Amino acid sequence: MPSFDVVSELDKHELTNAVDNAIKELDRRFDLKGKCSFEAKDKSVTLTAEADFMLEQMLDILRSNLVKRKVDSQCMEIKDAYPSGKVVKQDVNFREGIDKDLAKKIVGLIKERKLKVQAAIQGEQVRVTGKKRDDLQEAIALLRGESLGMPLQFTNFRD
């Protein structure tokens, strides 16, 4: 039976490249030079600046560099800014994988449309199986059309 997996993966290498490019752009910006910094740790980035408006500019720089490197900005989870001495810090976490709530929502969407496919939750991914390839492609089109708050990739398509 044909099947495919719905996953939400983050390319860590491209994320690192985007953060490195954002750091280089900070060095070129006269208004932010020496006043702001990015600190990357695994799947999180800490923004440090002297004022709140600088944090907003840094977030815009980070978003634009993520888009250039083709990393979807929907996976960003932006925390609230907090003061730390004379500076203001803000954490940005990058989510990866499909959590149980989103997986249930995906399965519910597929069942609600009464497509001739079955969806099963398998850890951090959803496996969709059906008798015809056309039914699977219809399910992919349905999921691409929905706004679920996380970037979805479709992998392991088998006939």
Swiss-Prot record:
Covalent S-S links between cysteines: none
Task: Name the Pfam families for this protein.
Answer: DUF520 (PF04461)
State where 3',3'-c-di-GMP 2 binds.
131, 133-134, 159
Q: How is this protein annotated for GO cellular component?
A: cytosol
Q: Residues that bind 3',3'-c-di-GMP 1, according to the entry?
A: 33
Q: Which InterPro entries match?
A: DUF520, UPF0234-like_C, UPF0234_N, YajQ-like_sf
Q: Which keywords describe this protein according to UniProt? A: Nucleotide-binding, Virulence
Task: Give a GO molecular function annotation for the protein.
Answer: nucleotide binding
Q: What does this protein do?
A: Cyclic di-GMP effector that significantly contributes to virulence. Binds bis-(3',5')-cyclic diguanylate (cyclic di-GMP or c-di-GMP), an important bacterial second messenger that controls a wide range of cellular processes.
UniProt lists the family membership as follows:
Belongs to the YajQ family.
What name goes with this protein? Answer: Cyclic di-GMP-binding protein PA4395
Organism from which the protein derives: Pseudomonas aeruginosa (strain ATCC 15692 / DSM 22644 / CIP 104116 / JCM 14847 / LMG 12228 / 1C / PRS 101 / PAO1)
Provide the organism lineage as a comma list.
Bacteria, Pseudomonadati, Pseudomonadota, Gammaproteobacteria, Pseudomonadales
